[in-house]
Curated annotation (Swiss-Prot):
It is an enzyme of class 6 (ligase). Belongs to the FGAMS family. The lineage of its organism: Archaea, Thermoproteota, Thermoprotei, Sulfolobales, Sulfolobaceae. Keywords: ATP-binding, Cytoplasm, Ligase, Magnesium, Metal-binding, Nucleotide-binding, Purine biosynthesis. Pathway: Purine metabolism; IMP biosynthesis via de novo pathway; 5-amino-1-(5-phospho-D-ribosyl)imidazole from N(2)-formyl-N(1)-(5-phospho-D-ribosyl)glycinamide: step 1/2. CDD domains: PurL_repeat1, PurL_repeat2. It is found in: Cytoplasm. GO terms for cellular component: cytoplasm. ATP binds at residues 39, 80, 468, 505. Monomer. Part of the FGAM synthase complex composed of 1 PurL, 1 PurQ and 2 PurS subunits. GO terms for biological process: 'de novo' IMP biosynthetic process. One of its GO terms (molecular function) is ATP binding. This is Phosphoribosylformylglycinamidine synthase subunit PurL. The active site is at 36, 84 (proton acceptor).
Length: 702
């Protein structure tokens, strides 16, 4: 196993202990101090994120496995996002499947029932390797989600050569629980017994350390965990059944027992008897038992008199469950094997790694002149790009209606919507923008929060909480670290502006290609919101198109610039425009003025028109009504924020309301049932082949 500890960190350990640590102790420290578990290179900046609010029940508190917010009627929404990037690059099926399993266990560790999954997938070009990665990632997610009966209700699928060697596989999960029944992940008192459910095997050895370094391609398959959704279903059902009988619950994720026990003890101590751990193979060494990341395991802190009843529930399913130790008052974590010490380290040492603040330097951005491209060529290239095609092939692999609570299904709108037990509608959306982040990570951080907020508004919802996942290259590289800092600053600023608390998140560094080049910065947010009033149900029909918001000539960091190069200006995020435009859309939904709507983002106005054209309708646009720039390419492909495209029978209402609110809204054209074509001013662009590509590209390419 490769240790990721630096020489300085190893000296700190030796100095604190006053001795040379044993091999097992080095592995223990390596797991707890890994970037994956400790956030040692990011924690200083993560503290700037707003994490409190009137509805927040549980937020970014140390060692809590998920955040929770009040959604009324005595219920709490539990929210979490995770990734399995490195494992998915090595074994995409199991890497993706175990990512789903892990996040489900994070949700049930709060005593919450999982009600919805989202998957945000980013892969490179669709060559043989890319096809293999994507097909197996999709299969892995579907295999686990479908088997345990949790619907995959939405997500993203993006293609960019920056992810050729290092795909990004993000999974988010929402759960629901009585707010008085939330279970903590940490304990407050000694004397509790540590109960472990599930077998421990050899898979996932050193997974936390593996996730905290660049991929080397050498002997890494053993660090990938193996998925068993049928065991996962037992874990989910029994954990929810016994949640009220236990004092704390923790998933055995990164770092295995080493991390779960130490974090659950939360500064107290623990004694673990490794010979009591149920093993899948008899020949596991004590050191491997400590750091194994075998899936489908949970750790419970239980009062002594409740141990037997807790384990009895698992044994009804012939599922292993054993009392393996206890929480102690002495602040020391001890792992024993048949009474002999294997590792014995102070809790403070394990929970207090030296924090890093690396040198940071903003990368010079070359402002290239804008490219001159024929409009027809630009339309074909942008509208046939894989990022904009129908993702039906992907979401058809998932059972998105299991549980019967899914209201807005994948492909039906900009946000997924599920019905909560109290009758309210919960909207969920994940957003990232690697192109904009590669140009300006600060503006990107603001923009992805604003886009998620707008996406929720398209179904009539207003955001109430978000979680983030910050995915970058090696933080020791100054340009990478500066992008990370800038992205956090942008996310923090936008979240504060919209009064949306960040209740959880994850940081994933060391995402690089085989040559050591970092991926484009890819921070991602997943926002949850509640529908205010009416729920929008999009339908395309004949009517007037209204563009809300101003279109600036901002083509740098867009899909257009990725395809054609060149640049121009980077889109500036104007949060007040996003807020006011979202308010107008929600008002329009509640007053019955909207038949179809979409936020304008990827692919610009042209990209927003594509779903209408794909339904067999014609669109006639007057470019003079798209105000803010005289550049026709800017009008069609700029990804300026604060904009919505609305289909309505009452365009005057929108123009009047927008004027009162201080923003722009103009009728820019009409939709007619006249075959798929785009008429821009006096030029007609047939769309039949583009529409055919829209529906056939993904399945045909695989």
């Amino acid at each position: 196993m490769i240790l990721t500890l630096s020489k300085t960190e190893m000296e700190v350990v030796r100095r604190v202990l006053g001795r040379e640590p044993k091999e097992a102790e080095w592995k223990l420290v390596d797991a707890l101090w890994s970037e994956h578990c400790s956030y040692k290179s990011s924690k200083v900046f993560l503290r700037s994120l707003p994490s409190t609010g009137p509805n927040v029940i549980m937020s970014v508190e140390d060692w809590q496995d998920a955040g929770a917010v009040d959604v009324g009627d005595g219920l709490a929404l539990v929210l979490k996002v995770e990734s399995h990037n490195h494992p998915s690059a090595i074994d995409p099926f199991n890497g993706a499947a175990t990512g789903v399993g892990g996040i489900l266990r994070d949700i049930i560790s709060k005593g919450a029932k999982p009600i919805a999954l989202l998957d945000m997938i980013r892969v490179g070009k669709l060559d043989d390797k890319g096809k293999w990665l994507l097909k197996n990632i999709i299969s892995g997610i579907g295999f686990y989600g479908n088997s345990v009966g949790v619907p995959v209700v939405g997500g993203e699928l993006s293609f960019d050569e920056t992810y050729n060697d290092n795909p990004l596989v993000d999974v988010a999960c929402a759960g629901i629980v009585s707010k008085d029944s939330i279970v903590p992940s940490v304990v407050r008192e000694p004397g509790l017994r540590l109960v472990l459910a599930g077998f421990t095997g050899l898979d996932g050895l050193g997974g936390a350390s593996f996730a905290s370094r660049k991929l080397s391609g050498m002997d890494e398959i053993g660090a990938v965990q193996i998925a068993d959704p049928f065991a996962g279903k037992i874990i989910i059902d029994v954990t929810l059944e016994i949640a009220k009988e236990v004092e704390a619950i923790k998933d055995l994720g990164g770092g295995g027992l080493a991390v779960a026990v130490t974090e659950m003890a939360n500064g107290l101590g623990a004694v673990v008897n490794l010979e009591r751990v149920p093993l899948r193979f008899e020949y596991l060494s004590p050191e491997d038992i400590i750091i194994s990341e075998t899936q489908e395991r949970m750790l419970f802190a239980v009062k002594p008199e409740k141990v037997e009843s807790v384990c009895a529930k698992f044994r009804e399913y012939n599922y292993p469950c054993e009392d393996i130790g206890e929480i102690t008052a002495e602040p020391k974590v001890r792992f024993l094997y048949n009474g002999e010490p294997v590792a014995e380290l102070p809790s403070d040492l394990l929970l207090s790694p030296p924090l890093n603040v690396w040198p940071a330097e903003r990368k010079p951005r070359k402002r290239e002149p804008e490219r001159e491209v024929a409009l027809g060529e630009a339309l074909r290239a942008v509208l046939t790009h894989p990022d904009l095609v129908s993702k039906e092939w992907a979401y058809s692999q998932f059972d998105y209606e299991v549980g019967t609570s899914t209201v807005v299904k994948p492909g039906q709108g900009d946000s997924a919507v599920v019905e909560l037990p109290n009758g309210k509608y919960l909207a969920l959306k994940g957003d990232a923008n690697q192109d904009l982040c590669a140009e300006d990570a600060y503006e990107c951080g603001k923009a992805i929060v604003a886009e998620a907020y707008r996406n929720l508004a398209t179904v009539g919802a207003r955001g109430i909480a978000l979680v983030d996942h910050l995915q970058f290259g090696d933080p020791r590289k100054p340009h990478v670290y500066q992008d990370f800092i800038d992205a956090v600053r942008g996310i923090s600023e936008a979240s504060k502006f919209f009064s949306i608390p960040v209740v959880g998140g994850k940081v994933s560094f060391h995402n690089e290609d085989k040559n050591g080049n970092p991926i484009k910065p890819t921070p991602l947010v997943v926002m949850a919101g509640l529908v205010e009033g009416k729920l929008a149900r999009n339908r395309v029909e004949e009517g007037d198109l209204v563009l809300i918001g101003e279109t600036r000539n901002e083509l740098a960091g867009t899909l257009f610039s990725r395809i054609f190069g060149g640049g121009g200006e980077v889109a500036k995020t104007r949060l007040m425009e996003d807020l006011i435009a979202s308010n107008l859309v929600i008002k329009g939904i509640n007053e019955g003025k909207i038949t179809w709507n979409k936020d304008v983002s990827k692919g610009g106005l042209a990209g927003a028109l594509l779903p209408i054209l794909a339904k067999g309708f014609s669109v006639r646009i007057s470019s003079s009504q798209v105000i803010g720039t005289s550049n026709l390419l800017g009008k069609m492909f700029s990804e300026s924020g604060g904009r919505f495209l609305v289909l309505t029978s009452d365009p005057q209402w929108f123009m009047y309301q927008a004027g009162r609110m201080g923003i722009q809204a103009l009728a820019i054209g009409k939709v007619t049932k006249d075959g798929s074509k785009l008429v821009l001013d006096y030029e007609t662009f047939p769309m039949d082949s583009i529409v055919e590509n829209y529906y056939s590209f993904l399945e045909g390419s695989l």
